Amino acid sequence: MADKNERPIKVMAENRKARFNYAIEDTIEAGIALTGTEVKSIRNGKSTIAESYADSKNGEIWLINATIPEYLQGNRFNHEPKRPRKLLLHRRQINKLIGAVDREGMTLIPLKLYFNERGRAKLQLAVAKGKKLHDKRETEKKRDWSREKGRLLRARG
């Protein structure tokens, strides 16, 4: 029987275009340092991570350009919607990510922003390489063909 305090993982924001625009090599789960009004605003489900990315500054990884709108009930202690947010990772993970970005020309992009079973805000971060236009077209052709194949199989019975 499940614990009373255990909650399911609840995805609050997802970057759907990331899998189309990037070839994803590896994913990693990172904590994210937030203020109280940011957590409440994310729980309202209005945040977006579609045009955001992660970057390294002074040996730390920061989430840049993620939009978490102001919490409506928050008064003068509200947060700035597009401020850089620190990602919480182990030193070994940070070194691995910085190495991939610096040496191999990879990009760090967020895939999902969610609350885990313990109610903590987490970010699924991907180490990815940008796709060229012809790669995107190829991905689209494969997707269309698999859709068409499914239709044909359903039609045949």
UniProtKB/Swiss-Prot annotation:
Q: Where is this region: Disordered?
A: 133-157
Any coiled-coil regions, as ranges: none
- Which Pfam families does the UniProt entry name for this protein? SmpB
- Protein's cellular compartments: Cytoplasm
Which PROSITE patterns does this UniProt record tie to the protein? SSRP
Q: Does the keyword RNA-binding apply?
A: yes
Q: Name one GO cellular component term.
A: cytosol
> InterPro entries from the xrefs?
SmpB (IPR023620), SsrA-bd_prot (IPR000037), SsrA-bd_prot_CS (IPR020081)
Q: What is this protein called?
A: SsrA-binding protein
